[in-house]
């Protein structure tokens, strides 16, 4: 009785299986000859008697069994026995019935190459490890990063973090990854450092680590609008973003004191007579006019603000002098930033955004040191002394900055209604300065009092007196 046996050469996949028709009353030795005849090129230099045949019933949906196949528990088909001894009934369909093992010394180059590839792949899989990665700050949910620790790269890790978390800091050129694990703190400077660190984690059987991203800040003046939009995720799907990518800032207005308005008008008229402003004016000339506006705004809050030209600040993404910083005297915090431009407002908005983040991140560090829960907002002005843009910057619960940008307010110094336009700008500045004081209001003081009591520290008499005052 003739039967059909599906045969597979050891090391091949199910796709390479081939059928053999033979009478089951024949010997296994006959089956070896038929297999050699069926695969003449594969077994060109092999005698049929040197083939080993194994009974291995593997169904076509269990290809994975071939990768970890052990022949120790399988039946070797002996040449002197009849095929019916091993296959008394019709063999099951859609299964491998016989595994063909050529002699080691005479295996074909194709089979040897395949074996090497399989061994290499298996070794590669054995070195691939799934790490649990958390990106700081304030991200409690991590993600899996599966990587071959002998081929891991810093760029690969950064790209995976960028894909999973999209942290703005990674858009900064030269971002540095600081990694913390129970084994210690690490700052891999190259791929080899990273691989050695991962191998240590594996040997310690601790596959979870936290990544802190540090960015070398660059000068504020080096930032372009497109790079700032990319840094803060403002470009959306636009390759050439415009200022419309910023959410609108509805800047409020507070009526200034008559004294401050009259003083500003007198000072502007004096400057117009002695230092005229025009489209050709340099930034230094425009700064004289801008200072007059800022001074008039601060005069509405005697002794509460200090205007500091060329104050130097630094933050996670930028450093350098500000054209004008407005500090709150009580706390010495920078609450306002002014960027004066000759005419390039787009670049001015970009620079101001990085300046605002730098100012706010510094305030946040101080707030963390004092265990304050809130640290307010910071405001910005971008202007050429004729057109005024107002900005707001705040941080979300994951310490990511968000920005808003107002529509411009324009002052035409030759117009008859000059005072109306000047007053409108001053109203916005006064409102900004009023808002800038709110983080230090009695409400925040009360929140800090409650927080100290909850932590087990009773408020001191001086604290309560300060609250009453």
Swiss-Prot record:
Question: Where does this chain carry the motif HVLVXXP motif?
Answer: 97-103
Pfam families according to UniProt: Crinkler
Q: Alphabetically list the UniProt keywords.
A: Glycoprotein, Host nucleus, Secreted, Signal
Region annotation (LQLFLAK-like domain) ranges: 18-57
Region annotation DWL domain: residue ranges?
58-96
- An example Gene Ontology CC term for this record: extracellular region
Q: Where is the signal peptide?
A: 1-17
Q: Where in the cell is it found?
A: Secreted; Host nucleus
Deleted gene: phenotype: Leads to an impairment of the symbiosis in M.truncatula and to a reduction of host PT4.
Q: What is its main location?
A: secreted
Glycosylation positions in this chain: 68, 126, 181, 248
Q: Per the entry, what induces it?
A: Expressed during symbiosis establishment in parallel to host M.truncatula PT4, the gene coding for an arbuscule-specific phosphate transporter.
Superkingdom of the organism of origin: Eukaryota
Subunit record text: Homodimer.
* Domain-level remarks: The CRN proteins have modular architectures that include a signal peptide, a conserved N-terminus, and highly diverse C-terminal domains. The conserved CRN N-terminus harbors a distinct LXLFLAK motif, which is followed by the conserved DWL domain. A highly conserved HVLVXXP motif marks the end of the CRN N-terminal domains and forms a junction where diverse C-terminal domains are fused.
Family recorded in the similarity comment: Belongs to the Crinkler effector family.
Q: What does this protein do?
A: Effector that participates in the arbuscule development step of the symbiosis. Arbuscular mycorrhizal (AM) symbiosis is one of the most prominent and beneficial plant-microbe interactions that facilitates mineral nutrition and confers tolerance to biotic and abiotic stresses. Is not involved in cell death processes.
Q: What name goes with this protein?
A: Crinkler effector protein 1
């Amino acid at each position: 009785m003739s039967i059909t046996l599906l045969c597979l050469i050891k090391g091949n996949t199910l796709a390479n299986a081939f059928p053999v028709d033979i009478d089951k009353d024949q010997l296994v030795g006959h089956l070896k000859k038929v297999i050699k005849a069926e695969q003449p090129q594969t077994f060109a230099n092999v005698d049929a008697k040197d083939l080993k045949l194994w009974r291995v019933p593997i169904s076509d949906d269990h290809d994975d069994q071939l990768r970890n196949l052990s022949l120790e528990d399988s039946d070797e088909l002996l040449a002197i026995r009849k095929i019916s001894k091993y296959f008394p009934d019709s063999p099951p369909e859609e299964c491998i019935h016989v595994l063909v093992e050529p002699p080691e010394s005479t295996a074909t180059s194709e089979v040897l190459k395949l074996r090497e590839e399989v061994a290499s792949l298996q070794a590669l899989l054995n070195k691939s490890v799934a790490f649990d990665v958390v990106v700081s700050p304030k991200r409690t949910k991590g993600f899996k990063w599966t990587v071959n620790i002998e081929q891991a790269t810093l760029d690969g890790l950064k790209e995976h973090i960028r894909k999973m978390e999209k942290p703005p800091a990674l858009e900064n050129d030269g971002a540095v990854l600081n990694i913390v694990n129970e084994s210690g703190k690490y700052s891999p400077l190259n791929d080899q450092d990273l691989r050695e660190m991962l191998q240590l984690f594996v040997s310690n059987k601790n596959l979870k680590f936290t990544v802190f991203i540090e960015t070398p800040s660059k000068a504020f003046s080096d930032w372009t609008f497109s790079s700032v939009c990319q840094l803060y995720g403002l470009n959306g799907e636009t390759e050439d973003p415009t200022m419309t990518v910023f959410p609108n800032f509805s800047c409020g207005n507070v009526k200034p004191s008559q004294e401050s308005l009259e003083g500003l008008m007198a000072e502007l008229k004096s400057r117009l007579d002695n230092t005229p402003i025009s489209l050709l004016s340099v930034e230094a000339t425009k700064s004289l006019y801008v200072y007059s506006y800022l001074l008039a705004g601060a005069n509405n809050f005697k002794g509460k603000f200090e205007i500091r030209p060329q104050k130097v600040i630094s933050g996670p993404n930028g450093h350098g002098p500000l054209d004008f910083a407005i500090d709150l005297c009580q706390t010495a915090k920078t609450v306002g930033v002014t960027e004066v431009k000759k005419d390039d407002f787009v670049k001015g908005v970009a620079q101001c955004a990085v300046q605002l983040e730098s100012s706010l991140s510094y305030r946040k560090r101080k707030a963390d040191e004092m265990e304050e829960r809130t640290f307010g907002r910071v405001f910005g002005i971008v202007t050429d002394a004729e057109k005024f843009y107002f900005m707001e910057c705040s941080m979300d619960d994951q310490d990511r900055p968000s920005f808003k940008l107002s529509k411009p307010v324009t002052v035409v110094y030759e117009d008859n209604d000059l005072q109306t336009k000047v007053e409108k700008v001053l109203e916005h500045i006064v409102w900004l300065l009023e808002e800038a004081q709110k983080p230090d209001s009695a409400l925040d003081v009360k929140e800090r009092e409650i927080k100290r009591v909850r932590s087990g520290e009773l408020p001191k008499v001086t604290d309560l007196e300060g609250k009453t005052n």
